């Protein structure tokens, strides 16, 4: 699972402020009449103002493209997201590799060939063994936190503990210095998407310093780390051994990028609005505009020109534990679905500029294959009468009381404010909600363990890559249920037909063919009312008046820092 940076990686329809340039960006600078020229965009210092991030910067411990777009400025991977605005930006493209990989054996084997001329920031060549070593170290217990897919997908991955004790993962083969082959336990047509994860970044074994590596990593991207203060500061300068001749996806316009983390969103937005000093050439990769700025957008044309809008493939929802009463009865689950007032939920998170109502689990967009459905139509404000009718059929004519768990922090978009909106809506239907607020630190631990999981909880799911698989598999595949903790299949669904369809879709290596199958599966599962979709978040982000080509990409739902330039 990937969470939004400020909310906790996606694709859906994107609205850009300005016209997309041929290079794949947009002249979003607003205050300049000069068009953005990707051939002449070098120079200057870009400032990045963030709320979160920078807690980790080791490619092994980052979760997919965690930390926004920043890691991909230092770490190249076998594949990467296509660096363009719009729907085309939801597809993977080759990065270190010459292509998206050659599948065989029903997508259980994937072969990649590295490009010529690849170099680390010290000038040494990058080879297939460097990529393998980078992947292997991500299995080390000393470097936790990365995406779990390789542990599950690679043969022997579940028991492998990394290379520090001399072990070798035999399911990754390097027959020569440019070839790397992956042997998987089961078919996975999405492997080219997974190969964008930072775990696929090459690491030279001779320069691996273990847990200290993030302080001075060896770069394969356009920038190298000059300074890293965990959780606070990151300064990037040019890697002189990188060039666009070997990397056609990263424009890498600024000479220097200075990132500050740990700022309050209100402070970030105030600094971006005022744009004094270095803040004139600043962006954020995790702070949506606040109420004050939203109110000004309609009346302040100059500010409106410095906003980009988009979405991240994410759904906020109510989760049922269908093994616990009263939610073992589908009529009770349906009653909750009818009772929900989505308009009040959207108002709680800032209004329609920042959220759109959801009746499907999959977000909008061709990449996900969403098929529109609304099996329990309640309109914008809910249907408490229909909910009461269903409760009566289920034997709860006098209503019932339920506990609702939620994190005690509103920044992720499913905290106390949303819980209050849900509580009020259910009250209208005769359902009394007992709020159960948990700390951010405890929330995933409690809700992710079946033995401690509350019957009803607020949850969020975001796309690790823009496709239906990483949305549906963790939530609905019965073989993904983890009794000891870390479980995301909160409904505890274990339907052989669903599991079989997941396996069949996983064999498909053409994303365009797989997408409608994922959409159809979502539509079929939705009939069981295993969860109640609430809303899909939107991004509305400011950028400084001296920033150009700041567009929100459709993979992660934030600015693509690799494409931004400063005046």
Briefly describe each language-model feature range.
Residues 83-87, 187-252, 256-258:
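Gly/Pro-rich hinge or "lid" segments in bacterial periplasmic/extracellular proteins
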Residues 113, 130-132, 143-204, 227-229:
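Surface-exposed binding/hinge segments that line
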Residues 99-149, 181, 271-274, 326:
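Aromatic- and charge-enriched surface segment that lines or borders ligand/interaction sites
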Residues 14, 229, 339-370, 414-423, ...:
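Detector for C-terminal structural segments
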């Amino acid at each position: 699972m990937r969470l939004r940076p400020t909310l906790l990686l996606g694709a859906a329809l994107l609205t850009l402020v300005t016209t997309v340039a041929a290079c794949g960006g947009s002249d979003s600078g607003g205050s300049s009449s000069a068009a953005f020229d990707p051939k002449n965009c070098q120079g200057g210092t870009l400032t990045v103002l963030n709320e979160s991030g920078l807690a980790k910067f080791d490619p092994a411990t980052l979760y997919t493209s965690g930390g926004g777009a920043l890691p991909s400025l230092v770490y190249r991977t076998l594949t990467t997201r296509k660096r363009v605005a719009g729907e085309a930006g939801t597809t993977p493209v080759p990065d270190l590799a010459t292509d998206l990989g050659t599948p065989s054996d029903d997508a259980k084997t994937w072969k990649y060939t590295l490009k010529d001329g690849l170099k680390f920031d010290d000038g040494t060549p990058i080879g297939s063994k460097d990529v393998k070593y980078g992947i292997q170290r991500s299995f080390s217990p000393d470097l936790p936190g990365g995406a779990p897919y390789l542990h599950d997908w690679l043969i022997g991955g579940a028991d492998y503990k990394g290379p520090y004790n001399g072990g070798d993962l035999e399911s990754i083969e390097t027959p020569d210095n440019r070839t790397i082959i992956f042997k998987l336990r089961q078919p996975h047509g999405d492997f080219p998407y997974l190969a964008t994860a930072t775990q696929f970044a090459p690491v030279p074994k001779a320069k691996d310093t273990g847990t200290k590596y993030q302080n001075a990593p060896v770069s394969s991207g356009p920038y190298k780390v000059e300074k890293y203060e965990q959780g606070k500061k990151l300064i990037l300068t040019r890697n002189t051994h990188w060039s666009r001749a070997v990397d056609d996806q990263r424009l890498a316009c600024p000479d220097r990028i200075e990132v500050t983390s740990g700022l309050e969103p209100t402070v970030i937005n105030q600094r971006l609005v005022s744009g004094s000093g270095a803040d004139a050439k600043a962006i954020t990769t995790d702070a949506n505009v606040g109420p004050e700025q939203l109110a000004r957008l309609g009346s302040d044309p100059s500010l409106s020109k410095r906003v980009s809008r988009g979405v991240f493939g994410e759904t906020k929802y109510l989760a049922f534990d269908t093994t616990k009463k009263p939610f073992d009865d589908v009529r009770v689950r349906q009653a909750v679905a009818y009772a929900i007032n989505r308009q009040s939920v959207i108002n709680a998170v800032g209004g329609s500029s920042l959220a759109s109502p959801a009746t499907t689990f999959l977000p909008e967009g061709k990449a996900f294959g969403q098929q529109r459905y609304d099996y329990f139509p309640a309109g914008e404000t809910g249907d408490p009468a229909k909910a009461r009718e269903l409760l009566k059929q289920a034997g709860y004519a006098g209503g019932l009381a339920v506990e609702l768990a939620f994190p005690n922090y509103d920044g992720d978009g499913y905290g106390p404010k949303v819980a209050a909106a849900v509580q009020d809506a259910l009250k209208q239907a005769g359902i009394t909600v007992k709020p159960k607020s948990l700390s951010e630190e405890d929330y995933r631990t409690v809700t992710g363990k079946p033995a401690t999981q509350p019957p009803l909880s607020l949850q969020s799911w975001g796309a690790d890559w823009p496709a239906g698989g990483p949305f549906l598999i963790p939530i609905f595949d019965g073989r993904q249920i983890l009794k000891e903790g870390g479980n995301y299949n909160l409904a505890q669904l274990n339907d052989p037909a669903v599991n079989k369809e997941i396996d069949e879709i996983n064999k498909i290596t053409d994303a365009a063919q797989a997408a409608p199958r994922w959409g159809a599966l979502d539509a079929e599962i939705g009939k069981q009312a295993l969860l109640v979709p609430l809303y899909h978040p939107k991004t509305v982000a400011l950028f400084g008046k001296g920033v150009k080509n700041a567009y929100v990409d459709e993979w992660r739902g934030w600015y693509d820092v690799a494409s931004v330039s400063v005046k």
